[in-house]
A protein has these predicted regions:
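Bacterial N-terminal signal peptides that target proteins for export
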Residues: 19-31
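Bacterial N-terminal signal peptides
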Residues: 29-40
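Intrinsic disorder/low-complexity segments, especially N-terminal tails and targeting/processing regions
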Residues: 12, 30, 43-44
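Active-site-proximal loop/helix segments of hydrolase catalytic cores
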Residues: 169-242, 253-259
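N-terminal amphipathic/basic-hydrophobic helices that include classical n-h-c signal peptides
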Residues: 1-21
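Metallo-beta-lactamase
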Residues: 41-169, 177, 196-199, 218-222, ...
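Generic recognition of flexible, low-complexity loop/linker segments
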Residues: 1, 279-280
Length: 297
């Protein structure tokens, strides 16, 4: 086709064809520009997504999507060290070097301060209002102004979240014997492929909503005093339903361990340790649910 020269008369059909070509070019340019802008916007919005719980995802996945044994899926698992300190306090040391202290009250002194402390407010033996200011992460199991606590945070290689529970009113204006809704928390720590739960100063049975919010637990720390928290029958029922591979007793006082073992049933083995620290990975979880009693419990 010969290009039209200046001054030539352009036939109407040719003029229309030129117009359509220009419009198509504009449409392509506009689509390209929009696609480029979209590529800039999507990553920014993706960064605003909430933290994801792997333990909840595994618990809610369809049966066929869940591996028979999670500990067989990793080529090399990382160890987590769990040390019994006293009462309801365990230290959890992660592969990334984060130290967590559960139900921290400030009474147990070690050479290294924890990086994270969790607290429950049932008694002063489970919290402190004056933690060392050098502890960077202080997580309360109770909220302000009667509201539930909402914990969902990542510290180093560990993701920490909570499940609110109710608490009996003990002292002062709260000494009514009634339950204070959402006054305490179960804390869950997700690290190195393990789901670790600390039931805290639990005062009541858990319903389906609680179990759904907890999700999968590989290791659970349970109070077995049978008095200040809840009955041995009640905590045994909860322990069985959680179906954790490892059960770590705490808050025992003078309760005979055999009484707890008799109630939770013969499907649990018992492993009494001479040391106070359990070093464990998802690969080394016991095949049979086991109550591990660390030195000092």
């Amino acid at each position: 086709m010969t290009a039209a020269k200046f001054g030539d008369t352009v036939p109407p059909a040719a003029f229309a064809a030129m117009g359509h070509a220009m419009l198509r070019s504009l449409n392509v340019s506009l689509a390209t520009a929009l696609a480029f802008l979209g590529s800039l916007i999507v990553p920014a919005s993706a960064q605003q997504q909430p933290l994801r719980s792997e333990c909840l995802a595994m618990a809610s996945a369809p049966p066929l999507a869940v591996p028979v044994s999670l500990r067989r899926t990793a080529a090399k698992a990382e160890d987590v060290a769990i040390t019994y300190v006293g009462h309801s306090t365990y230290y959890i040391d992660t592969p990334g070097g984060v130290r967590i202290a559960t139900d921290f009250n400030g009474a147990y002194r070690t050479e290294r301060l924890p990086d994270v402390i969790t607290m429950n407010r049932a008694h002063s033996t489970h919290y402190t209002l004056f933690p060392d200011p050098k502890i960077p992460h202080v997580l309360h199991g109770w909220g302000e102004n009667g509201q539930a606590a909402h914990v969902s945070t990542r510290v180093g290689d560990v993701y920490i979240r909570n499940v609110p529970t109710d608490i009996r009113r003990y002292y002062g204006e709260d000494a009514s014997g009634a339950m204070l809704k959402d006054g305490n928390s179960i804390f869950i720590f997700e690290v190195a492929g393990l789901c670790i739960g600390h039931l805290g100063h639990l005062h009541h049975k858990l319903d389906d909503t609680h179990f759904a919010a907890i999700g999968r637990l590989d290791i659970v720390m349970v109070p077995i005093d049978g008095t200040y928290t809840m009955s041995l029958d009640g905590i045994s029922d909860i322990t069985r339903r959680l179906r954790a591979s490892v059960v770590l007793p705490m808050h025992r006082f003078m309760t005979p361990l055999d009484e707890f073992m008799r109630r939770i049933g013969q499907q649990f083995e018992i492993d009494r340790r001479g040391e106070g620290t359990l070093t464990i990975s998802r690969e080394s979880l016991p095949a049979t649910p086991t109550v591990i009693i660390l030195n000092g419990v």
